[in-house]
From Swiss-Prot:
This is Holo-[acyl-carrier-protein] synthase. It is found in: Cytoplasm. It comes from Aliivibrio salmonicida (strain LFI1238) (Vibrio salmonicida (strain LFI1238)). Its EC number is 2.7.8.7. Transfers the 4'-phosphopantetheine moiety from coenzyme A to a Ser of acyl-carrier-protein. It catalyses: apo-[ACP] + CoA = holo-[ACP] + adenosine 3',5'-bisphosphate + H(+). Keywords: Cytoplasm, Fatty acid biosynthesis, Fatty acid metabolism, Lipid biosynthesis, Lipid metabolism, Magnesium, Metal-binding, Transferase. Its cofactor is Mg(2+). Mg(2+) binds at D9, E58. Belongs to the P-Pant transferase superfamily. AcpS family. InterPro entries: 4-PPantetheinyl_Trfase_dom (IPR008278), 4-PPantetheinyl_Trfase_dom_sf (IPR037143), ACPS (IPR002582), Ppantetheine-prot_Trfase_dom (IPR004568). Disulfide bonds: none annotated.
Length: 126
């Protein structure tokens, strides 16, 4: 296995919370996939959840080498959790096509947050 992509991102939770207060769920709908949005709707700490998802998707787009551009959107990345809480990143759309072109066979994702920030790192391996 070889690393074919590495990305990291940090998001300020308060900034995400302000965006939510300005635009409401429209901001969340722009960032989250349908399954993520359904989970988000039942949460108390929506800003924290969204900041972690935002950081993870930005990190994934950087690992892909495109950022959120060139046809890659936030909806191309879905984050779920396994039974132990480990985050799982699933690709779709243009992100999936580009990852297949780079022979990505394994994705590593870690997400962490503390009082003011959420951070994520993504590694793509072939």
């Amino acid at each position: 296995m070889a690393i074919v992509g590495l990305g990291t991102d940090i998001a300020e939770i308060e900034r995400v919370e302000k965006a939510l207060s300005r635009s409401g769920d429209a901001f969340a709908e722009r960032i989250l996939s349908q399954s993520e949005f359904e989970r988000y709707q039942g949460l108390k700490q929506k800003g924290r959840f969204l900041a972690k998802r935002f950081a993870a998707k930005e990190a994934a787009s950087k690992a892909l080498g495109t950022g959120i551009s060139h046809g890659v959107t936030f909806h191309d990345f879905t984050i779920s959790n396994d039974d132990n809480g480990k985050p799982i990143l699933t690709l779709s759309g243009k992100a999936l096509v580009l990852s297949q072109q780079s022979s990505v066979s394994h994705i590593h994702l870690t997400i962490s947050d503390e009082r003011h920030y959420a951070v994520a790192t993504v590694i793509f391996e072939s």
